[in-house]
Amino acid sequence: MQKVVLATGNAGKVRELASLLSDFGLDIVAQTELGVDSAEETGLTFIENAILKARHAAKVTGLPAIADDSGLAVDVLGGAPGIYSARYSGEDATDQKNLQKLLETLKDVPDDQRQARFHCVLVYLRHAEDPTPLVCHGSWPGVITREPAGTGGFGYDPIFFVPSEGKTAAELTREEKSAISHRGQALKLLLDALRNG
């Protein structure tokens, strides 16, 4: 099996990708297991940051790398929190603080102007100098609610209402979410690209 470094320390992401990519002869290992520190995310887009993370992991380990960069873009806020989604409420950000800050920011915004999208970019680099990385982008439209609902998922899921499902992302089962989410879409594109060589 070809060992591939996943540019994350998130055990959940590692497990998810490892099970899906094992069929392609890829052995997914978290960068933290290989002693790789996180890359500095200096890009201004999800694509730039995913490439920075993948290139850093590939350079340090000498292995192919996969990286993910994702976040929430709210239309009325010009795409914010965007690439700053995980640290929207500041240096000591938590999911709860980020969610509360977004609800407070949108408190006077009418219901018909609360559209948002989750974005996920997955990048696969064959090596650190790969000039043609695989870049896969998934986008998931929804609406920001006024109150949290549901206990599943993480991040902004409790306030991200999915009109097609009639519930928030936090109220979806893991299987339901994976089938339609931004990350699920990006992962499907990556699997298709790997399958087709």
From Swiss-Prot:
Keywords assigned by UniProt, alphabetized: Hydrolase, Magnesium, Metal-binding, Nucleotide metabolism, Nucleotide-binding
InterPro entries: dITP/XTP_pyrophosphatase, ITPase-like_fam, RdgB/HAM1
The keyword Ribosomal protein is assigned to this record: no
Substrates-to-products reaction catalysed: XTP + H2O = XMP + diphosphate + H(+); dITP + H2O = dIMP + diphosphate + H(+); ITP + H2O = IMP + diphosphate + H(+)
Molecular function as annotated in GO: dITP diphosphatase activity; ITP diphosphatase activity; metal ion binding; nucleotide binding; ribonucleoside triphosphate phosphatase activity; XTP diphosphatase activity
Cofactor: Mg(2+)
Keyword field contains Magnesium: yes
Binding-site positions, substrate: T8, G9, N10, A11, G12, K13, S70, F154, G155, Y156, D157, K177, H182, R183
One cellular component (GO) term of this entry: cytosol
GO terms, biological process: nucleotide metabolic process; purine nucleoside triphosphate catabolic process
Pfam families: Ham1p_like
Domain of life per record: Bacteria
Details of cofactor binding: Binds 1 Mg(2+) ion per subunit.
Binding sites annotated in the UniProt record for Mg(2+): E40, D69
Active site as annotated: D69
Documented EC number(s): 3.6.1.66
Role: Pyrophosphatase that catalyzes the hydrolysis of nucleoside triphosphates to their monophosphate derivatives, with a high preference for the non-canonical purine nucleotides XTP (xanthosine triphosphate), dITP (deoxyinosine triphosphate) and ITP. Seems to function as a house-cleaning enzyme that removes non-canonical purine nucleotides from the nucleotide pool, thus preventing their incorporation into DNA/RNA and avoiding chromosomal lesions.
Complex and partners: Homodimer.
Family matches, as HAMAP family: Non_canon_purine_NTPase (MF_01405)
Family note: Belongs to the HAM1 NTPase family.
Protein's name according to its UniProt entry: dITP/XTP pyrophosphatase
Organism whose genome encodes this protein: Escherichia coli O157:H7
Gene name in the database record: rdgB
